[in-house]
Amino acid sequence: MKNVLMIHLFWAVLGLLLLIGCGQLEEPIEEPTAVPPTPLSQISPTPPPSPTNTAVPTATATPTMTATATATATPTATPTDTPTPTPTPIRFAVIGDYGLVGQPARDVSDLVKSWQPDFIITTGDNNYPDGEAATIDENIGQYYHEFIYPYRGTFGEGADINRFFPALGNHDYSPTDGFQPYLNYFDLPGNGRYYDFVWGPIHFFALNSDWREPDGHHQNSVQAAWLRDGLAASTAPWQLVYMHVPPYSSGLHGSAAVMQWPYAEWGASVVLAGHDHTYERLIIDDLPYFVIGLSGHPARYWLVDEVDGSQIFFNQDYGAMLVEATETEMFFQFITRAGEVVDTYRLSQP
């Protein structure tokens, strides 16, 4: 009997060992539950940092000066229907030989507009090559329409008063239509070919130095008599005369004897011209003369024959003149399109 019990015990132990060896009595291990990945479209992006010290644009100041230009059949010795703007000081730009589509003209116009001048005067050659109606808006209005009133072109809005006062140049004469495209495009005082206006402390006289001027361009002409009488009658602190062909120049075209009128004797304070594609300042008989002809035409001229009295001659880059004036001072600067101040000159009342 004892032997039978031992045999049963042996087989029971053996079965238990087999079960343990096969792993059937091992405690089950719980597998972690898999978490599906979040789709990229549902991940909220990290918000960008809020900008700091953001510059707030400042509104451009609107010029307060006013000058109206009413065309008349013939110019008068003093401006008509041209109210004198106040107050002073005033700030204006001078450009010359600029009227040709291209990068130099674009650069100079950007420079001039960055000054926020009250108005612009030009020393001629506004519309290369031949003063035609077909090219006048792209050569002028494209760059300066904001200053022209009334503006009849296609490049944007014009000014609410006229702030653009050109002088006629030889390239503003059309072989077929004469000065008419120019006269149709602008609404200027007087007969439009030569005229005057007062702005702040300055009485401006724009001349037509072209030989095709009906009233002549020599010292004994109708035009010269008009200037002489106008200068004599002027009561402004300053009298500024401007034209295209220079009375004195050291550049390629040189001095034009026919325009060497007695400006100082007649009462002019300063004389501006263009024609030579240079910048030059001269003092002749104690009167300052400037040549401003680097405002857009790609050709730049060289020094040919230095005139006695020449103070500075420059032809290395394109640019324009900035003038600031009060009743007692006029301050002239010629500045290149790169912002280089080439020359400064100050006039003071005695």
Regions found by a protein language model. Name each.
Residues 2-10:
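Bacterial N-terminal signal peptides that target proteins for export
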Residues 19-21:
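C-terminal motif of bacterial Sec signal peptides marking the signal peptidase cleavage site
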Residues 26-88, 350:
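Ser/Thr-rich, Proline-interspersed low-complexity disordered segments
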Residues 31, 86, 312-350:
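A short C-terminal boundary segment appended to hydrolase-like catalytic domains
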Residues 83-139, 229, 249-250:
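N-terminal active-site segment of His-dependent metallophosphoesterases
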Residues 97, 124-125, 169-170, 207, ...:
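Active-site glycine-centered loops adjacent to acidic/histidine catalytic or metal-binding residues
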Residues 113, 132-238, 256-270, 276-326:
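Extended active-site neighborhood of metal-dependent phosphoesterases/phosphodiesterases
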Residues 234-250:
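Short acidic, glycine-rich surface-loop motifs adjacent to enzyme active sites
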